[in-house]
């Protein structure tokens, strides 16, 4: 919590992971004013340096752009939350006969990590510097560290002629008791055949069968998937927020 005298004016979370400090969950009451946001940024930089961290990564609402930009933060991407009903009338369109969709398992972790690295390469969602980072994130999702994993609603797509690389994948878990789609990804060579829409619809239909009426996701603004989600009935459910990074001089 953030306090002004005896009055709470906001909240945030500050923690460390490896050589990086992280600041997220920043919410300020309107009466706090822009000066409080600037103080938060300055204090986070001081604490990061005191911890000998090399980077400070921050996630914050777009309303605080000026305070972070003024201290040298470089914007990585803009994201927004979206929500949709799982009761959707669109049918599952047939896929090419060479593709097979099945429920994913822990044995798929390495291949899903490879798929995510290939799918996000060169784009704003390419957040891990190496394959190990992607595989670690997939393992964390399946192990429930983002919220209880829902295996019945998580799928991979395989190509009959390539057993070493996945064509697509989608994962789902609970976030505050609401299903969340995490990393809908399609390999570059299998785009524009309807695979992304197929996986998304399959997950939404399975969630509906399990009694979940809504599903959420977070998407980077400006990527093609944003339009896909709109077609599937997703609407923006919150403000745009920024993910940014600043190097720390220690």
Regions found by a protein language model. Name each.
Residues 31, 136, 190:
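Glycine-rich phosphate-binding loop
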Residues 55-59, 181, 215-219:
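Conserved hydrophobic beta-strand within the GNAT/NAT acetyltransferase core sheet
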Residues 100-115, 121-125, 238:
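A short beta-loop-alpha structural element at the N-terminal edge
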Residues 29-99, 242-244:
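Acyl-donor-binding surface of acyltransferase catalytic domains
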């Amino acid at each position: 919590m953030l306090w002004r005298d005896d009055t709470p004016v906001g909240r945030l979370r500050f923690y460390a992971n490896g050589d990086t400090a992280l600041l997220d969950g920043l919410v300020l009451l309107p009466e706090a004013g822009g000066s409080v946001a600037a103080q938060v940024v300055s204090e986070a930089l001081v604490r990061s340096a005191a911890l000998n961290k090399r980077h400070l990564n921050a996630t914050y609402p777009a309303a605080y752009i000026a305070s972070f930009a003024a201290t040298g933060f470089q914007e990585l991407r803009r994201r927004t939350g979206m929500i949709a009903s799982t009761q959707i009338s669109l049918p599952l369109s047939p896929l090419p006969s060479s593709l097979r969709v099945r429920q994913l398992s822990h044995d798929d972790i390495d291949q899903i990590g490879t798929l995510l690295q290939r799918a996000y390469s060169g784009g704003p969602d390419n957040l891990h510097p190496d394959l190990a980072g992607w595989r670690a994130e997939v393992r964390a999702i399946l192990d429930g560290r983002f919220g209880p994993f829902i295996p019945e609603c998580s799928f991979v797509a395989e190509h009959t002629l390539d057993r070493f690389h996945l064509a697509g994948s989608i994962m789902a878990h609970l976030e505050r008791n609401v299903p969340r789609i995490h990393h809908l990804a399609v390999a570059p060579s299998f785009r524009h055949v309807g695979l992304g829409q197929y996986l998304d619809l399959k997950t939404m239909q399975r969630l509906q069968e399990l009694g979940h009426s809504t599903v959420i996701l977070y998407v980077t603004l400006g990527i093609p998937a944003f339009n896909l989600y709109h077609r599937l009935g997703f609407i923006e459910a919150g403000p745009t927020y920024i993910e940014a990074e600043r190097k720390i001089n220690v």
